[in-house]
Amino acid sequence: MTHKTVGEHLVELLELQGVDTVFGIPGVHTIELYRGLGSSKIRHITPRHEQGAGFMADGYARASGKPGVAFVITGPGLTNIITAMAQAKLDSVPMLVISGVNRSDTLGKNLGFLHELPDQQGLAERASLWSRIIFKPEELEPALNDAFRDFATKRPGPIHIQIPTDVMKLH
């Protein structure tokens, strides 16, 4: 991962996992992910609402047999996709939700940052098989490998990975 940001590397790793479609709405908390999509073969579909992104990812997974992938911003982006995640969990549908989150040094401090949730990971854990936050670039690839391994070897369902905006920009 020489000159690529974590966000760009994430898109590259998704391609290596066979992801060909991502659903989501670009926002300030996911801009680094979208920089990576520009040079990727992954097709991006923009819904009108993050809940739509979740249900599109769910439908894609049901129709294709491959995990559906969605990018969402922190706060309202994540809360809007929770209903689709809960349905995917109950119906055993493989879905990977990648969300941005505020800077790592602000997490859990309730400082009132844009779209800050007091416990975003705790919220996502209730509607997913597991939720993980990436604090260092080297944590990204193992997290994605774990997600795709679990999709293939365990009862499927949604998995949530969140990446702070400052970590997304790291090389």
Residue spans for each PLM region:
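N-terminal alpha/beta PP-like core and its mobile active-site loop of ThDP/TPP-dependent enzymes
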Residues: 1-171
